[in-house]
Amino acid sequence: MATRARATILLLLAAVLFAAAAAASGEDRRRETSLRRCLQRCEQDRPPYERARCVQECKDQQQQQQERRREHGGHDDDRRDRDRRGEGSSEEEDEGRERGSRRRPYVFGRRSFRQVVRSDQGSVRLLPPFHQASSLLRGIKNYRVAVLEANPRSFVMPTHTDAHCICYVAQGEGVVAIIENGEKWSYAIRQGDVFVAPAGTINYLANTDGRRKLIVTKILHTISVPGQIQFFFAPGGRNPESFLSSFSKGVQRAAFKISEEKLEKLLGKQDKGVIIRASEEQVRELRRHASEGGHGPHWPLPPFGESSRGPFNILEQRPRFANRHGRLYEADARSFHDLAEHDIRVAVVNITAGSMNAPFYNTRSVKVAYVLDGEGEAEIVCPHLSRGGRGGESEERRRERGKGKWREEEEEEEEQQKGQEEEEEEQVGQGYETIRARLSRGTVFVVPSGHPIVVTSSRDSTLQIVCFDVHANNNERMYLAGMNSVLKKLDPQAKELAFAASAREVDELLNAQQESAFLAGPEKSGRRGEESEDEDRRRRRSHRGRGDEAVETLLRMAAAAV
């Protein structure tokens, strides 16, 4: 008995030791994963001059976590430390965000942005690559969304990037300078302006307003590494670091023909950051050198018309659609020459409080929308999420779950191809998932081509959205309801077969809505419907009353005749 008891104890002890080792191993894996993610964010989202500091912060944070665990014997939440650095959140929050990503892979809240530039005078926030959030967004993996905010009378350092930048001025006014093909073009910009800074061109800007922030929303088309953007600063010093200082001293002396001492003094002096304060006189001189041109029509394109350089004010154009429920302004390659080679259309949508846009989809373009102001709700109809529920799962989470390490690019391609083949075997028309999302200032949402979308403004505020439509050439906007509904074009026989109803009944359905593009929202239309029903009831009662009076009159006349 004693021997059996001793054996049982030894087995239990071995089991405990094994469990402890497994737990420690699991904890080590979690720490390794957390550190790897932190380092990856440094590489992808931080400019070169901040990367070394970011890597050191990741290592320091990892060491602090280990010390806290040793001291307290538990797993402390390090969210405060990470938020202070703008580097994300804890493992538990990452998992929660993954679950949210699977439910709503096309919607990104304000917290999804990461600050890649921070100073007392402003910031630049960058949305992570779309394909990292969901495999459904692989089609726009080369695009990123960024928001620049510059305080009054601030200056953004000259830089160039390896991405084409299509910009919309959401608020304020300033000047922008772009050096391209050996020429410097300097323009005044204001709210409603669209301008383009091609990849590799040196550009800088200043907020010339003494009271308001300058806010510029951007979509960046990366051309080197898909989804990754690098900022290059030639002028600079220690912060931002000039890339000129990375050349050898001999190359620097030969290139500039000045002494090493002067070079070190010049390239090591600036340390105030990417966005700095400018004096009133400096701002006035920058404004004086800026051209006021470029806000008029940019069509026809050369050689049939004269090219007009500079920004294009979208809000000064005639709306594409306009009624009491909303307005749609657009700038495309036909109206703005600078967009011609980028296959992007820029649109600004204003939806009146309590109204909505008519349901529609784009035939070719992918809509990347940023909420400028107001609140509302978006409904996106998606067929992918109804097939097994894994369509919106993060690439990173799938890689970790599959092998516990990063897969090679070839394995990713094989997995994607396999998934596509499985999807092709699915039966079509077997259900859709409706993605519903609350919208507020700073929300980004993506609408893939072919996906129907409705955006409703809250009853308390007008909703204003800027949209960057990627792959805009030859795109058509197909409205599904309203006077311009594409369904009205169906043959009568097609209507009968498709709806299993008579063509007359289908026409009654399609012709009931007498407005186009922008409609009364659910609450407004609901109230109008109730008012209409009340009016019908009153009318019927009124008709009944007059009929009763007529009957009584006829009876009296008949009685008198008798």
From Swiss-Prot:
Glycosylation sites: 350
Domain Cupin type-1 as annotated: residue spans: 106-264, 312-507
Keywords for the protein's UniProt record, in alphabetical order: Allergen, Glycoprotein, Secreted, Seed storage protein, Signal, Storage protein
Compartments, as annotated in UniProt: Secreted
Chief location category: secreted
Region called Disordered, residue ranges: 63-103, 383-430, 516-550
SMART domains: Cupin_1 (SM00835)
One GO CC term, this protein: extracellular region
Signal sequence interval, chain numbering: 1-23
Compositionally biased residues, Acidic residues: 409-427
Basic and acidic residues composition bias: residue spans: 63-88, 390-408
UniProt GO MF annotations: IgE binding; nutrient reservoir activity
Family designation: Belongs to the 7S seed storage protein family.
Purpose of the protein: Seed storage protein.
Protein name: 63 kDa globulin-like protein
Organism: Oryza sativa subsp. japonica
